[in-house]
């Protein structure tokens, strides 16, 4: 497995194109999210030139996982789309808190059989660790993410220091929460 972390301009056009297609396959086709994006490319308003990414590839250079990192000093998913998850707590806006979003570790050539396998897989752990390392190098002390409630237990079981930033809420039928992960 090869994991690359960097800003959009650090990725070749070929890798960035494969990355956009991978996200489309995961979030639109596999998870069924209704997103306003062109066919076979998933990007949103938070994907900009200064957005950071983590991309995992297998030995055949197929993408098997990814994550997006944004400092909370600029618009970010939790702050713009899901602020209710903070239950009235002020939105983080600090160079020391980065948002982790669009996290996936789906290997379409070898898919997991359960949701817990997908979140606790070695690829998931490696992507999260690389995201933490990259964010730390940028000055972050915490990551914040919008996550399904089951992720909290899996993060702790994997040894990450994670806690709730607000109470869980049901959004579109899913129990979600804002999660802080210490870097």
From Swiss-Prot:
Its EC number is 2.3.1.184. It comes from Acinetobacter nosocomialis. InterPro entries: Acyl_CoA_acyltransferase, Autoind_synthase. The keyword S-adenosyl-L-methionine applies. Disruption phenotype: Deletion mutant does not produce OH-dDHL. It catalyses: a fatty acyl-[ACP] + S-adenosyl-L-methionine = an N-acyl-L-homoserine lactone + S-methyl-5'-thioadenosine + holo-[ACP] + H(+). The keyword Transport does not apply. Induction: Positively regulated by AnoR. Keywords: Autoinducer synthesis, Quorum sensing, S-adenosyl-L-methionine, Transferase. Involved in the synthesis of the acyl-homoserine lactone (AHL) signal N-(3-hydroxydodecanoyl)-L-HSL (3-hydroxy-C(12)-HSL or OH-dDHL). Probably part of a quorum-sensing system with AnoR. This is Acyl-homoserine-lactone synthase. It is an enzyme of class 2 (transferase). Transmembrane segments: none annotated.
